[in-house]
Amino acid sequence: MYKSEKLYYRKAFFMAMIMGVILFLPFVLIDGGYFIYYGDYNAQQIPFYTLCNQAIKNGSFMWSWQTDIGANFIGSYSFYTLGSPFFWLSMPFPAEFAKYLMAPLLVLKISCCSLFAFAYIRRFVRKLQSALIGGLLYAFSGFSMYNVFFNHFHEAMVVFPLMLIALEETVVNKRRVFFALTVALNAFVNYFFFIGECIFLVIYFLCRLTDPKFKITVKTFLVLAFESVIGVALAGAMFVPAILTCIDTPRSSNTLNGWNLVFHNPAQRYGLIFQSLFFPADIPARQNFFPDSSARWASVSAYLPLFSMAGVISFIKYKKKHWAKWLMPICLLFALIPVLNSSFVLFNNNYYTRWFYMPILVACFMTAYALENSEIDMKYGLKWCGFAVVLISMVGILPSEVSKDIVDIGTGDTTTTKVTELFQLPNEKLPFWISVVLAITAIIVCYILVRNKAKLRTNKFLQKSYCFTMVACLCFSYYTLIYGRAIGPKVGDYNNIVNATIELDDDSFYRVETYGVTNNANMLWGMYGFRSFHSILPGSAFEYYSGMGFSRSVNTDPDGSYYAMRSVNSTKYLVIQSYKLEYSDTKTLLENLKNFEKIDEQDGFTIFKNKAYI
């Protein structure tokens, strides 16, 4: 490797790191030293890092009693933490310091995404500068920013490019062993994403066969097959218990059938898929364009900052014989047909598009290729992007039926009636129109950038494009993170929960129920809990809850009518933030839990004791 090329590798890593610091630092400063978001990030990522750190250091890495009513430690946490190399970087630090490491680790993940995407893309482009642009687009893509909510998804984004590089090296340069190691790494890091990567790798392999330079012999094919098996075997210590635990959960056995194999239901998912290509990412649980798509947690986001699909569409138009031309339409077809989409999650009926980061990587390469090649006119792709943005934006003005209260002036009586109004269809109007404005602005700025592409020297144009890309990545990422943080907890509220000191002078075995605070708060306090928010538990836990008459999906959150379950589960204490005692739902809970009596107040929390504790 030439010295100048090494410089670009460093640039791919450190420029993304600087941008990551610029992106996350304001949030860290506002929230008192660590990054707070909303939803699953607050309820799972920080508590799980804390619990796993403590468990490993205490030697409790076979069975976790702090997870619901008890769970296989490796099977339950391989999906979230144990396979992540970034989690293991947190192990030298005290468990209570985990919350301060979340933002630095996110920055490191983004930096690695940029580096490894650059390493992949440089194989297919002439200019290293264009590969730098592709690396940034991958690291700060809509998928990447959407899934800050699911912090552990970035690990798959980091290691996936390495497997594609290894495949290329095995076939093109006849290198051995590297593919087996990357298969092992991907399977070890996250078994869920690895299954989808296997499906994509088959599609990728078949498309690459159309390239004369990608020559496959029987020997090479057998080497790939052998190294694939060896790779999975090497990851077996993590992969096998994780798979066994996963298939033991009820949700894993639900599959598609009937018309749902062929057509998405609800039909709004089709609109959501196309919206994800041309607009900044909606955040989880906020589908503003297509609110009835039933895809609140599906990670439907494939937007590339500034360029959108302009580079991809232009590439397909002007490179008719290139292997990548076939890959993207095939991936779109998989996304549009439910049974094909579900193949990435072993045909489960839960709707997810968490495999989008794989075609996004290729889309980043196609965009980088289009930027450096004068024969590709990106204005062609921009026209189609503009058409798509205008068409999808029409959702915002479509007539919809809304309820209106009408007051009779004469009698003063109020009646509710249905009326048809414009501009009422989006779920949340302000984020909707901000997203529209950002998408339109990106098209205009991109047009200004590429209109004089032919007149500029390639290197000068790519340097200009790189600067535009950096600014765009930060702007679109800020939009997503500010939106998510705005609907998160008030500044200081989550800090009070995380840093609370709850001391119960009790040597017996007991569980603590927390109510009105973040899920899994007991993990932050080092206590056994009654409530839990965790997707992967042993099948026996689900059988137990079913026998108790409680239907559990991903959350153990029985209402007050299950007062007997609390005693059976050895729930001895109930902890509630004191200022929430006046809330109506809190009062309802306490009315049902008559066996609980107030015994103490600590650090802004009121503690109740169960007189019927077993």
Identify the role of each PLM range.
Residues 19-114, 136-158, 246-251, 259-303, ...:
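Membrane-interface coil-to-helix junctions
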Residues 174, 193, 323-497:
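Contiguous transmembrane helix-bundle modules in multi-pass membrane proteins
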Residues 16-20, 110-123, 129-210, 223-243, ...:
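Membrane-embedded helix bundles of polyisoprenyl
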Residues 1-28, 223, 460-468:
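Start-transfer (signal-anchor) and selected internal transmembrane alpha helices
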Residues 91-92, 428-430, 462-614:
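Soluble catalytic regions of membrane-associated enzymes that act on cell-envelope
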Residues 113-120, 159-171, 199-207, 308-313, ...:
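Transmembrane alpha-helical segments
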Residues 214-222, 311-335, 456:
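Membrane-interface helix-loop-helix junctions at transmembrane boundaries of multi-pass membrane enzymes
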Residues 43, 47-52, 78, 85, ...:
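Periplasmic/ER-lumenal interhelical loops and adjacent helix-loop junctions
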